[in-house]
């Protein structure tokens, strides 16, 4: 009787398993680095050149086009020196009082916002700095996801590393929304007061800064008691606001 050899199941060698796991991880890492470099290159470019649009501007324009295909945004870039210092102080006073001190993240504001959210049991306050808001406006969608928040954090770090505080504030004032289809402080000053951004008085600046939180609503509710009260508070804080 002839004995036959029974074949034993082969087990993958440890080195082969490591290779199988390592390759997809390296590929994912390469894709992530390539994706981040896209943001980095844009930000380095904007050290010298002005952004002509933003992700948020494009999103708003698409929304407007669904209602009116001929709709256009009001937007005109204006250099830092041509923006009223009153307006700069007003925006910092209301949006990011420690703008000149932090490196992109105001941990005190985040703590206050977190406690407020816990008290109200909802996401009512965010504690985002001007740099964080700029990261969202320039590159990101309005989705509220963990991935988007992580991406916002990375972009904020890049902004703070490669742009000066002065440049961050200049771009911010030129790209944020100030009303229905109104983007940038020059368009806002002309839309609401019929004057250039360089001529904004303290009272006008405080009022404009107070509408940043909900610009489209306040575009049609300009005499809202809540808005006017907020503007008076901002006006009282102008002398202590520090600008680049």
From Swiss-Prot:
This protein's GO CC annotations: peptidoglycan-based cell wall; plasma membrane
Main location, first listed in the record: membrane
Compartments, as annotated in UniProt: Cell inner membrane
EC number: 2.4.99.28
Domain of life of the native organism: Bacteria
TM spans (from-to): 25-45
Pathway it works in: Cell wall biogenesis; peptidoglycan biosynthesis
Stated family: Belongs to the glycosyltransferase 51 family.
Functional note: Peptidoglycan polymerase that catalyzes glycan chain elongation from lipid-linked precursors.
Protein's name in the database: Biosynthetic peptidoglycan transglycosylase
Source species of the chain: Nitrosomonas eutropha (strain DSM 101675 / C91 / Nm57)
The gene coding this protein: mtgA
